[in-house]
Amino acid sequence: MKIYLVGGAVRDALLGLPVKDRDWVVVGSTPQEMLDAGYHQVGRDFPVFLHPQTHEEYALARTERKSGSGYTGFTCYAAPDVTLEDDLKRRDLTINALAQDDNGEIIDPYNGLGDLQNRLLRHVSPAFGEDPLRVLRVARFAARYAHLVFRIADETLTLMREMTHAGELEHLTPERVWKETESALTTRNPQVFFQVLRDCGALRVLFPEIDALFGVPAPAKWHPEIDTGIHTLMTLSMAAMLSPQVDVRFATLCHDLGKGLTPPELWPRHHGHGPAGVKLVEQLCQRLRVPNEIRDLARLVAEFHDLIHTFPMLNPKTIVKLFDSIDAWRKPQRVEQLALTSEADVRGRTGFESADYPQGRWLREAWEVAQSVPTKAVVEAGFKGVEIREELTRRRIAAVASWKEQRCPKPE
């Protein structure tokens, strides 16, 4: 029996990155030997065991053979005669097909070290094309390591295109697509994930609402980058700088979906694209089974982001109504989230990356004023039932009006 550290732990250690999880491969053993040594079996489809002390995963070396469609259509073979090289060959990328023995020596049968040094994401073997989930995984790795200037090998991108055109991605379940997307949204450069999907044709298959934005022009005065798809990825990049929250980043990604519905004869203007985009947000989220809380914020951002850009022109009643519409009284975090997504929208434009966004500050200040109006005073004044809500709203509007007169510049 020989045990090797494999995969991501070896890769990230070589890159000088923090190692989160460690996975091990056991060569020359059987399930019974593992059980006799005190390991606990957890794998159903193939033999995976938990270490009795560390609870880290130890998998028997195995091979995989394509036996059906999609990413689950594989037959696994695990036996003492499966070599380490056999096990590593089934992995997706060469940089993930590295192992380390107990002496610290790196075993590298597929030139993963060379690709690490050259910052290349390259598939190990043609078997890569048998698992459509790997298209998403490579896009996610490209986003995860974009700050280290990794790029996808030409032959790997070509294979990803072939897989997409062959319809392989249609076998992916919504849950797996969202899981990979959610992971990509946590990276430092989530926009790279969607750019890679577009480069291999997968964006049109998995995110047609986003793909439809490319080639749709916006007024050059407000959008020097002109192309709405490019603007969308720029805003996502900016959102990633402003907030680590997946819901803020996803909502920013979806903020302009309505522009994809504008008839070409009306280009480059997109009047009413915000409310129009709400249905597309719902459609995308329903298809991918996006969690409700993330979906709800994306809907609100699509509907109201342009309203916040015009904040100095909003009257106090409209401002308080906005807080009602986003359910800020019960979910106050939405005010900050809306401020951040709107700021990402403004700064996600060519030449505006460092622009100030005072509307965000005014939105936050107006919220502090409105929510500081005490409900208790309204009740103590004798108002009852529906009158309480009406009087509370009136007082909030008055408070915001007083604040706006002093703090918010009047529109010219």
Swiss-Prot record:
Q: Which residues bind Mg(2+)?
A: D21, D23
Cofactor needs: Mg(2+); Ni(2+)
Q: A Pfam family matched by this chain, by name?
A: PolyA_pol
HD domain location is: 228-329
Task: Give the record's keywords alphabetically.
Answer: ATP-binding, Hydrolase, Magnesium, Metal-binding, Multifunctional enzyme, Nickel, Nucleotide-binding, Nucleotidyltransferase, RNA repair, RNA-binding, Transferase, tRNA processing
Q: What does the record say about how the cofactor binds?
A: Magnesium is required for nucleotidyltransferase activity.
**Which residues make up the binding site for ATP?**
G8, R11, R91, R137, R140
Provide the reaction this enzyme catalyses: a tRNA precursor + 2 CTP + ATP = a tRNA with a 3' CCA end + 3 diphosphate; a tRNA with a 3' CCA end + 2 CTP + ATP = a tRNA with a 3' CCACCA end + 3 diphosphate
Q: Where does CTP bind?
A: G8, R11, R91, R137, R140
Q: Where is the signal peptide?
A: none
Q: Supply the EC number(s).
A: 2.7.7.72, 3.1.3.-, 3.1.4.-
Query: Can you cite a GO biological process for this protein?
Result: RNA repair
GO molecular-function terms, A-Z: ATP binding; CCA tRNA nucleotidyltransferase activity; cyclic-nucleotide phosphodiesterase activity; magnesium ion binding; phosphatase activity; tRNA binding
**Quaternary context:** Monomer. Can also form homodimers and oligomers.
Reproduce the miscellaneous comment text.
Answer: A single active site specifically recognizes both ATP and CTP and is responsible for their addition.
What's the family?
Belongs to the tRNA nucleotidyltransferase/poly(A) polymerase family. Bacterial CCA-adding enzyme type 1 subfamily.
- What role does it play? Catalyzes the addition and repair of the essential 3'-terminal CCA sequence in tRNAs without using a nucleic acid template. Adds these three nucleotides in the order of C, C, and A to the tRNA nucleotide-73, using CTP and ATP as substrates and producing inorganic pyrophosphate. tRNA 3'-terminal CCA addition is required both for tRNA processing and repair. Also involved in tRNA surveillance by mediating tandem CCA addition to generate a CCACCA at the 3' terminus of unstable tRNAs. While stable tRNAs receive only 3'-terminal CCA, unstable tRNAs are marked with CCACCA and rapidly degraded.
Domain note: Comprises two domains: an N-terminal domain containing the nucleotidyltransferase activity and a C-terminal HD domain associated with both phosphodiesterase and phosphatase activities.
Entry protein name: Multifunctional CCA protein
- Gene encoding this chain? cca
